[in-house]
Amino acid sequence: MRANKKLNIVLDIGKTNIKLIFFDQNNKVVKSFNSKQRSTKKHGIKVLNSPSVYEWTLQKIKTVEKKYQLNKFVCTAHACSTALIDFNDKELIACTDYEFPYHKYVKGYQKIIPSFNESYTPLLENGLNTGLQLYYLNQKKPELIKKTKYFLNYPQYITWKMTNNYTSEISYLGCHTHLWDFKKNKLSSLVKKLKFQNKFPSNEKAWKTIGVKKIGHSKLQIINGVHDSNASYLYFKNSNIKNFTLVSSGTWYIIFNQKNSLKKLK
């Protein structure tokens, strides 16, 4: 017999650990599951086991749905992991692993990145700039880029798997990527230089319902998704707490401070 409770679901993908959490309408945890994220080699680079993460998630959701009604689903994920989807709606890469040393294999990236005051993104090593990952693929794997219809951020990759709808989202797209112009609120000059303007789906709000997935007797609303630490920051920003500093911990420590002025950043 199924309980009357309607559950909301959060898939929280960290670089090391994955959590799938089921909440009731009072935000009390009813069920939770844990897994690990792993990587392998494909097309000569490190890629994450994102398709397996999706299948694991779907299997757990189906199991819980036998006892509970389901309401909404949202995915949060760590930054700098991108899926490449071809024109037949198949994965070419899902998803890139930022621990691959992209910076060792290509030159010239530093010459074409936007100014700091455009993207507010420092130049980082390995794949910690999504723009560097895409620059590498454009230089070393042009055949993959030609086959690519869309680049999907990790949360929106999961959303696409759930709904078959393509979207982007600003908290992820702008998170140390070199891909977003914060002053003009649009894709950056780097995207234009690489001629990738049409390879990013339209931006939607993180909290927008993108589609509905039928699972058992439930019609599960699929929310667009968001970068994990930004989701934590938004929660406290919308609370009554003022002038706070947030430390988001896990594989990385990310620090947010409301008082910092963008003019002071270099």
Task: Enumerate the language-model features and the residues they cover.
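Short, hydrophobic/amphipathic alpha-helical packing segments
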Residues: 54-62, 131-134, 227-234
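Gly/Ser/Thr-rich active-site cleft segment
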Residues: 13-15, 117-219, 223-229
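Glycine-rich phosphate-binding loop of actin/hexokinase-like ATP-binding domains
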Residues: 82-109, 148, 152-187, 220-266
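A short acidic-Thr-Gly-centered motif at the start of a beta-strand
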Residues: 1-3, 212-217, 236-241
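Active-site phosphate-binding/coordination module
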Residues: 67-130
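Glycine-rich beta-strand-to-loop/alpha-helix junction loops that act as flexible
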Residues: 73-81, 206-208, 249-252
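N-terminal glycine/serine-rich phosphate-binding loop of ATP-dependent small-molecule kinases
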Residues: 1-94, 147, 217-224
